[in-house]
Amino acid sequence: MATKVAEIKTLKQGKYLVLGGEASKITSISTSSPGKHGAAKARIEAVGIFDNQKRSLVKPVNAKVDIPIIDKRVGQVLAIMGEEVQLMDLETYETIDLPIPEDLKGDIAEGKEVEYIEAMGNMKIMRTKGGN
């Protein structure tokens, strides 16, 4: 589980953080100052990368949260086996079996290159690369 730590005030929409043990992408972030002597609070709405669950968090802006280290890679489709696809990583040449995302079912074909991410021990195909 590769993570690093950052303060909430450094986070922006579109960045990633760990909520509920899952790597999540921030969809909205807002801050509010409660009053004269209170610390500013941040409300974060995020969606899980791998499970698509909505999560929210309310904490002071100077609180620390875990940030997942996300590795974006490129692989070539070797074989399509029903609902799964077998990829070969183009850097390490290792083969990986991953499920095909619903939105990419028609786009993935043998020999095509796809981008996939690896974070916290999970992998997911994100998109197909153009030109193939």
Swiss-Prot record:
Q: What keywords appear on the UniProt entry?
A: Cytoplasm, Hypusine, Initiation factor, Protein biosynthesis
* Compartments, record wording: Cytoplasm
The Swiss-Prot or TrEMBL record annotates one GO molecular function as: translation elongation factor activity
UniProt keyword rRNA-binding present: no
Q: Which CDD domains does the annotation name?
A: S1_aIF5A
Keyword Endoplasmic reticulum among record annotations: no
Pfam families in UniProt: eIF-5a (PF01287), IF5A-like_N (PF21485)
Q: Which residues carry this modification: Hypusine?
A: K36
> GO biological process annotations for this chain's record?
positive regulation of translational elongation; positive regulation of translational termination
- The organism's superkingdom is given as Archaea
Q: What's in the GO CC field?
A: cytoplasm
Which protein family is it in?
Belongs to the eIF-5A family.
The entry's function note states:
Functions by promoting the formation of the first peptide bond.
| NCBIfam families named among the record's database cross-references | eIF_5A (TIGR00037), PRK03999.1 (NF003076)
Q: Known PANTHER family for this protein?
A: TRANSLATION INITIATION FACTOR 5A FAMILY MEMBER
For this entry, the protein name equals Translation initiation factor 5A
